[in-house]
């Protein structure tokens, strides 16, 4: 488990020699909960190379192609689960009447074109110059160098931003602000 702002990994396990690891960031955008907005979590499942040895940080730091599954969960007006096992992305919606997730979006793909982007405008004074230039070009709309109008979306959650991009396309930016 890794906590926002803390780059170290904190392993929590009842079985230190477990075959699989669950890595997650719980309640990304939790500030949204007090405003009755959606919050979410991102997760990944990894398989350990050596089960007979104690779990180490290296077990967690594997390249993306080695992950067994990954996804995100959204908690809001409906509860959604978006999941990949490396062969496409599927979306599931919780059916509260029966307590199961139902496949509602098979083969989700990112649209090839979008007119939206997400970035925290309150951090603009800290953005690197290329980021400032790109955002300025987008905000200038159809009269600007990009020749079309853009919509800026921001809700302080990378998980919600990732879901929005999967459904509507666009870009989520979180530039280093020092």
Regions inferred by a protein language model and the residue ranges of each:
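IMPase-like, lithium-sensitive Mg2+-dependent phosphomonoesterase catalytic core
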Residues: 1-178
